[in-house]
Regions:
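Tryptophan-centric aromatic hotspots in well-structured domains and transmembrane helices
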Residues: 12-14, 88, 126-128
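Short helix-to-coil transition segments within interhelical loops
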Residues: 16-24
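Terminal transmembrane helical anchor/hairpin motif
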Residues: 100, 105-175
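Functionally important transmembrane alpha-helices
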Residues: 81-112
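Short, small-residue-biased leader/transition segments that mark boundaries at the very start
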Residues: 2-10
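Secretory targeting signals
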Residues: 29-93, 138, 144-148
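Membrane-interfacial segments
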Residues: 9, 13, 49, 53-61, ...
Length: 175
């Protein structure tokens, strides 16, 4: 039934786990690894394409390579944290419209996070997109910001630890 597509999953994690012989937590981690590789690759390609586009249109200002690499790495960590969160949410909530809705709210948090107080940006993975802004204009001058490497590292450690903890607990749940 086409109308029920977004609200029901076609396969329950525990049913899939039971038929495949792989634990639910391992399935989540495998999904993260496969999708994470794609997300990481696309993030690097996007970064390279932006640099190439700047050269193509004739941007002549000096290229801040180390700053750009740091920014790309930061965005990759944030993208992977969002991916991990969305994978867990999709598994834990039966109605997939909830996961979709949370993702849409996250997009708005990412877009408008710059107007939030800094501490609020740290409360969701999407808030980190605003924290990782590499530069902005002050008047007519382009000003580069110091990237929040410590905050991004914290997101990686806390997000990764929570993902491992939750997926490990999936293995102890009854089917």
């Amino acid at each position: 039934d086409l109308h029920s597509f977004p609200t029901r999953r076609s396969s329950d994690l525990h049913s899939l786990s039971a038929t495949s012989g792989v634990s639910p937590g391992h399935l989540c981690r495998a999904k993260f690894i496969v999708l994470g590789l794609i997300v990481a690759l696309v993030t690097m390609m996007q970064s390279a394409l932006l640099v190439g586009f700047a050269k193509l249109i004739g941007v002549t200002s000096p290229f801040p390579a180390s700053h750009w690499i740091g920014y790309t790495a930061s965005i990759m960590v944030i993208n992977l944290a969002v991916l991990a969160f969305q994978i867990l949410l999709s598994v834990m909530v039966e109605n997939q419209i909830v996961a979709l809705g949370v993702g849409i709210v996250g997009i708005f948090l990412a877009l408008f996070g710059v107007i939030l107080p800094r501490f609020l940006m740290h409360l969701t993975p999407w808030g980190y997109y605003a924290l990782a802004a590499p530069a902005d204009y002050v008047g007519v001058d382009l000003v580069y910001y110091n990237l929040p490497y410590l905050s991004i590292a914290g997101l990686a450690v806390v997000g990764g630890s929570l993902f491992m903890l939750v997926t490990t607990r999936f293995n102890t749940r009854e089917a």
